[in-house]
Amino acid sequence: MGIHGLAKLIADVAPAAIKEHDIKSYFGRKVAVDASMCIYQFLIAVRQDGNTLQNEEGETTSHLMGMFYRTIRMVEHGIKPVYVFDGKPPQMKSGELAKRSERRAEAEKLLEAAEEAGEVENIEKFTKRLVKVTKQHNEECKKLLTLMGIPYVDAPCEAEATCAALVKAGKVYAAATEDMDALTFGTPVLLRHLTASEAKKLPIQEFHLNRVIQDIGITHEQFVDLCILLGSDYCETIRGIGPKRAIDLIRQHKTIDEIIDNIDLKKYPVPENWLHKEAKHLFLEPEVVDTDITELKWIEPDEEGLVAFMCGEKQFSEDRIRNGAKKLAKNRQGSTQGRLDDFFKVTGSVSSTKRKEAESKGSAKKKAKTGGTPAGKFKRGK
């Protein structure tokens, strides 16, 4: 779910923090991709006659087709993706997960009614609401990525938190996910729509955290409190406080505790046993991989292994899989070229104008070769 209404709020109050780019702008970039979010998208979008793709045994293959072709698209544009898989959800998410189970149960009832009535549109709508990423989906995608030569990371907890940690450590340029809470976890750069269908023609949205908090006029800790007031996966919100009111209150009172001390509690009742402090700690000190020992390696694809798995087991077209493997191998060589800005360590907030100037100068010269991205120190909670 992420953070309720955060993208719209940033667009309204800090529009300069959002840039829109074409996928070609990310040549030479390493990006941490939220795997579970991608797989969910593929299960929803990659369909035939309203149903997920399946092999002859009735096994779902939509996630594999989506992962294979979207990854190739990124690699063809010089992007080096690393997929990050969710680990065990935090205990504080149990309430949100219970709500999702209830919504699925309700969708099952509505689907039955739609099937009895023969309502085609409703059948498709409620079928999509039942989509859930399973352990098998994850394991099959990991196997596919290994054969493609693409690295992946198993997060100990939330994938978005580990994506953010990889960005802060200088291992990758950005976190790619539709969940806005990657910003709350502290990723300096968030990309949305990177793995969206090409047919949708959606520009990639690039959010810069430093510019968000600078333009709103708050600190990162206050931004986390703001996100908690907007609504997250980890605790309830104060009913009656919308986005505009939340910003005004944070600017005026600085912390949620001070807000509680100063608002009319009859008008704005605070949830009983409200876990906002625990939620804040989870955002500021999340459980993530040790980035100091995390190595990301992009290697040659295993064409024969891909054919055995995708064609032998999953019954995809051999010609298409071999063609895809050759594209991976070809573009892997091309993407070893680096970006000019990889040679410079950026400190603090960089304006989009300066970054564009640097990139335009770099594109006019012969691209330099580099052995990787500069490694930075990762500090939890920043």
Swiss-Prot record:
Mg(2+) 2 binds at D179, D181, D233. Binds 2 magnesium ions per subunit. They probably participate in the reaction catalyzed by the enzyme. May bind an additional third magnesium ion after substrate binding. Residues 1-104 are annotated as: N-domain. GO terms for biological process: base-excision repair; DNA replication; DNA replication, removal of RNA primer. Phosphorylated. Phosphorylation upon DNA damage induces relocalization to the nuclear plasma. Keywords: DNA damage, DNA repair, DNA replication, Endonuclease, Exonuclease, Hydrolase, Magnesium, Metal-binding, Mitochondrion, Nuclease, Nucleus, Phosphoprotein. Its cofactor is Mg(2+). It is found in: Nucleus, Nucleolus; Nucleus, Nucleoplasm; Mitochondrion. Belongs to the XPG/RAD2 endonuclease family. FEN1 subfamily. PANTHER family: FLAP ENDONUCLEASE 1 (PTHR11081:SF73), FLAP ENDONUCLEASE FAMILY MEMBER (PTHR11081). Structure-specific nuclease with 5'-flap endonuclease and 5'-3' exonuclease activities involved in DNA replication and repair. During DNA replication, cleaves the 5'-overhanging flap structure that is generated by displacement synthesis when DNA polymerase encounters the 5'-end of a downstream Okazaki fragment. It enters the flap from the 5'-end and then tracks to cleave the flap base, leaving a nick for ligation. Also involved in the long patch base excision repair (LP-BER) pathway, by cleaving within the apurinic/apyrimidinic (AP) site-terminated flap. This is Flap endonuclease 1-A. It comes from Xenopus laevis (African clawed frog). The gene is fen1-a.
